[in-house]
A protein has these predicted regions:
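Transmembrane alpha-helices
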Residues: 14-20, 109-141, 188
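A short glycine-centered flexible hinge/capping loop motif at secondary-structure junctions
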Residues: 17, 21, 25, 29-33, ...
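Generic hydrophobic transmembrane alpha-helix motif, especially the helices
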Residues: 19-92, 125
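Single conserved hydrophobic/aromatic residue that forms the stacking wall/gate
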Residues: 1-13
Length: 206
């Protein structure tokens, strides 16, 4: 069940990354002007704080566990998604189909989530797939140093940490969880590459 715990963390992280980062970037790019400037300044401040420091402090203050790790990642790992979403919005906000929706009286949020979002779903999905290995590695690192998921729950990081204590006597036991975690992260990266080639017309033409 150790890979299931790590993969489950990646799935939950994927949903919150799309919800927070994507919405933030789309709104910032669509409204522009002072709204975009203020939102981007906040984004720069949030991105300037080391993410691992925030996650570690939250785990020291709150009770360690899956919910705390998800909450910590939710506060720190949405910046990349928001930048991708904003860049795509800036490309499409002045396109004819958006201008036509405005002319017909469509509201801002209808245009953002019903008109623009379906047209940028490719880059969004690709970014999500690339972000999941980061979440898995962060959880594994925190569990390895004793700040992750507590007993009786178990993840790949906590399993590696436990086997590391007996590395001098049974070094071969630590190899399987390391290989599993590496393959899990590699599979998401390969999936992201495949989705990018399948969903990006520019990649198809190369």
């Amino acid at each position: 069940r150790d890979p299931e715990m790590s993969r489950g963390l990646g799935d939950v992280y994927k949903r919150q990354d799309m919800l927070i980062g994507m919405s933030y970037g789309l709104i910032s790019g669509y409204f522009g002007g002072k709204v975009d400037m203020l939102m981007q300044r906040f984004l720069e401040v949030a991105n300037g704080i080391p993410r691992l420091v925030i996650v570690t402090l939250l785990l020291l203050v709150l009770q360690p566990g899956m919910i705390t790790i998800i909450f910590a990642l939710m506060l720190t790992e949405w910046v990349g998604m928001s930048r991708i979403a904003r860049a795509e919005m800036l490309k499409l906000k002045d396109q004819e189909f958006v201008l036509a929706s405005r002319t017909l009286g469509a509201g801002s949020f209808f245009i953002i989530f019903k008109e623009v979002l379906p047209n940028i779903i490719g880059p969004i999905i690709t970014q999500v797939m690339f972000s999941i290995p980061t979440a898995i590695f962060t959880e594994a690192f925190l569990s390895f140093v004793g700040l992750g998921i507590p007993v009786p729950q178990c993840s790949l990081g906590s399993l590696i940490s436990e086997l590391y204590n007996s590395f001098t006597t049974h070094p071969y036991q630590i190899i399987p969880p390391i290989v599993v975690m590496s393959l899990l992260m590699l599979s998401f990266n390969l999936l992201a590459d495949g989705l990018r080639e399948a969903l990006d017309p520019k990649m198809k033409s190369m």
